[in-house]
Every structure is written in C-alpha cells, then in structure tokens.
Amino acid sequence: MTDAPILVTGGAGFIGSNLIDALLAQGHQVRVLDDLSTGKRSNLPDDSRLQFIEGSVADASLVERAVDGCRAVVHLAAVASVQASVDDPVGTHQSNFIGTLNVCEAMRRAGVRRVLFASSAAVYGNNGDGGAVDEDTPKAPLTPYAADKLASEHYLEFYRRRHGLEPAIFRFFNIYGPRQDPSSPYSGVISIFTERAQKGLPISVFGDGEQTRDFFYVADLVSILQQALDVPVVEEGAVNVGLNHATSLNQLLADIGAVSGGLPPVKHLPARLGDIRHSCANNARLLQRYRMPPATEMREGLARLLSS
C-alpha cells in the first residue's frame, strides 16, 4: 500500500498542517479527519493529493471510513486544553480517549498497523521536581486531559500486543511554531505571548513566571514524525519529545522582547489549579531511536513565528 494515503487526524490544526506540508512535499497521498473545532481549513493547501473529511474522531463509523485504505495513521486529534478537560471532563473524554479507541478499532478492522500518537508530558504531573523526566518517571496525571492521554497509551500498547498494531507513542512537551492560533483558548503560551507583544497588549502570567517548560519547534517535531512513519520497527514504549532544556516563562518573555524589540507590561496573576510547575524532557530515548535534526534555538524559532 505504498501509494495508499496517510491519515492525519486533527490535520487542520497547528502540528497536523505542518506535518501535512512535509508529507505532500515527500510525494505522499494524505487524508485528513478534522472537525474544525480548533483547526482551520485554511491551514491546508489546495492539493489534489489531499482528501479532507470533516468530522470528529468520537464518531466511530466516520473514523472507520477515514482509516479504510490507509497505510498509516497519525493521531493528533484532541481537545488540547487542560482547562477544557477540567471544565468538561465528559465532553473532552470523547475526543481525547474514545477517539483513540475508535482509531485503534478501525485500524484493527482495516488491517492498518502503523500509528503515531500524540501523547503529552502532562502524564508526569508534577513529578519532575525541576529536573528532566525520563519515560519511566512515575505517572501522576493531574487533569482529565492527562489521564485520557495516559489511558490512550495503555490501550495502544494493548492493541500492539493483542492485534499487532505498531504504535509510536510520543509525549510532546511544549511544541510551538507557525499556525499556532493565539486566539484559541487551547493555544500555547508562546503564540499568545508573541501576538500580544506584536500588538503592544499587556501580557498575563499565571504565577511568578519561574515555572519552566521544555519548548520544541514544530519543524523539528515534523522531522521526527516523518521518520517514525517509515522506520522498519517501532520499539515498544513512549518517547519524550523535548530538548532536555528548561526555559522559565520569565526567560521566554525576555527572549520575545529581544526578538520583537520590546515588551508590553507584564501582569502576574494567581497560579491556576492543575498547572504543572516544572516540565523538562530527558530525551535520551528520542536521540537513540531517531535522527534528531539540529535543534532550532529559541530566538530563531521565535523570529520565524513572528515573521509567519
């Protein structure tokens, strides 16, 4: 099925659309399943090799139709918001867990084996203590979003053992880059901060700003996902996707100011329930399994984002 399409769920979103550009450039056929709740049809190119299906991964029959005839699946679709999962755990569970189960079942029935899954560093909770967490760090999900991601990982490994699926599970840390919509309530901190800096609007920081994140540029992630589609064997076990480098929000703001020529006023608000204090990836397994491209440095990535 070398000419068969690659299905990307959530493909109209930030990460998915960047991946699709790269897949089309490689000559692949691509199929997208996206309900456009946060993704945008305008993120996708007008290309005869791209088939778009509008709908949710929570719709089992639609997922079955989308998976049929594909050679692999990249499962990115999710309600990617900690706060949304806290406010509506039942609703977000449909996309964030039931959607994964629907993908697994559709793949089993269609005989499709390779699946790339976007899990999250949120599965570790606050177990980092400021240091880099490896994949064996005890899991302590603090929110329904994190719990759904961890449960999805377990189901994917079950389908590996029982039905021969080949899941490549990636625990994304903080991915950023072009097309990350700053107006979305689910957007990442970098896109929100950079947009407000460009417009001269005050920037709100929850807490003291010394909380840290491991930021990873989207083009570097796309390179890894492309490799994972084609490696002969997908080894068992999730893989952290990060740089093993922690950046505080205060340092991030300083970098944005340096790249954009200045910062508007910064207002500190009370820390939010469920927010993780420190998050940094031990990426030894990533470097062992995949060819890591030269990492995009923060200020270079910010400059690309600001000019996009």
Predicted regions and their residues:
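Conserved mid-core alpha-helix of short-chain dehydrogenase/reductase
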Residues: 62, 102-106, 215, 220-223, ...
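Hydrophobic alpha-helix immediately C-terminal to the catalytic Tyr-X-X-X-Lys motif of short-chain
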Residues: 151, 155, 159, 189, ...
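Glycine/proline-rich active-site loop of Rossmann-fold NAD(P)-dependent oxidoreductases
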Residues: 150, 175-191, 201, 206, ...
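N-terminal Rossmann-like NAD(P)+-binding domain of SDR-like oxidoreductases, especially those catalyzing
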Residues: 1-173
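Hydrophobic pocket-lining residues that define ligand/cofactor binding sites across diverse proteins
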Residues: 107, 160, 197, 205, ...
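Conserved C-terminal active-site "lid" loop/helix of NAD(P)H-dependent oxidoreductases
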Residues: 218, 250-251, 269-294, 300, ...
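Conserved beta-strand segments of alpha/beta enzyme cores
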Residues: 29, 49-51, 166-168, 202-204, ...
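Hydrophobic "lid"/C-terminal helical patch
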Residues: 19, 225-229, 253-256, 283, ...
